[in-house]
UniProtKB/Swiss-Prot annotation:
Regulation: Inhibited by HgCl(2), iodoacetamide (IAA) and, to a far lesser extent, by SDS, hydrogen peroxide H(1)O(2), KCl, NaCl, ZnCl(2), AgSO(4), CdCl(2), FeCl(3), PMSF, Pepstatin A and EDTA. Repressed moderately by many organic solvents such as diethyl ether, ethy lacetate, acetophenone, butanol, trichloroethylene, tetrahydrofuran, methanol, chloroform and dichloromethane, and, to a lesser extent, by propanol, benzyl alcohol and chlorobenzene.
S-S pairs: none
Pfam families the UniProt entry points to: MatK_N
GO terms for MF: cysteine-type peptidase activity
GO BP: any one term: proteolysis
Uses: Has a potential role in leather processing industry due to its dehairing activity for animal hide without hydrolyzing fibrous protein. May also have application in detergent industries due to its stability and its ability to hydrolyze blood stain.
Homology family: Belongs to the intron maturase 2 family. MatK subfamily.
InterPro entries reported in the protein's UniProt record: Maturase_MatK, Maturase_MatK_N
EC number, UniProt record: 3.4.22.-
Note: On the 2D-gel the determined pI of this protein is: 3.4, its MW is: 43.67 kDa.
Protein name: Cysteine protease Nivulian-2
């Protein structure tokens, strides 16, 4: 496990790498280390929103066999979720949907899904939107349930 001072050193190192036009994700096989790393990033300026932290936890969980991954910032488009404030994260019937505004891949997928009547029925049943089409947001409840689900997935390795 990381002692608290090590988490601070990692955050300083990540900030320095980010300022030098590099992007870094560090991962160990121990999932508690990954959780501590992500939770230490929660206060950083360049990771501001909760959905990006969920996605980072998912990324670290899926690629936990990597020891480190450092790439030039010009390849940062793969990791647009870390700096894009327009991420939409929805959970419905134990499934997660992620969409980032402005990325061509997500735009194409959302246009394909827009033609599907099943999506409209699912959204209407789940009451994600009111009668005017505006989203009904419960960020605290969603955040809490997602943290519980992520912790359950991580602890059942």
């Amino acid at each position: 496990d990381f002692p608290p001072n090590t988490c601070c050193c990692i955050c300083c190192f990540i900030d320095r790498m980010y300022q030098q036009n590099h992007f870094i994700i560090s991962s160990n096989s121990n999932s508690s280390n990954q959780n501590k790393l992500v939770s230490s990033l929660e206060g950083k300026v360049w990771v501001q929103d909760v959905p990006s932290l969920h996605l980072l936890r998912f990324f670290l969980y899926e690629y936990r066999n990597w020891n480190s991954f450092i790439t030039p910032k010009k390849c940062e488009s793969m990791f647009v979720f870390l700096r894009d404030p327009f991420i939409h994260y929805v959970r419905y019937q134990a499934k997660s949907f992620l969409a980032a505004r402005g990325t061509p891949l997500m735009m194409n997928k959302s246009q394909m899904l827009e033609n599907s009547f099943l999506i409209d029925i699912a959204i209407n049943k789940a009451k994600f939107c009111n009668a005017l089409g505006h989203p009904i947001s419960k960020p605290v409840r969603v955040w809490y349930l997602d943290i519980i689900r992520i912790n359950d997935l991580v602890n059942h390795d």
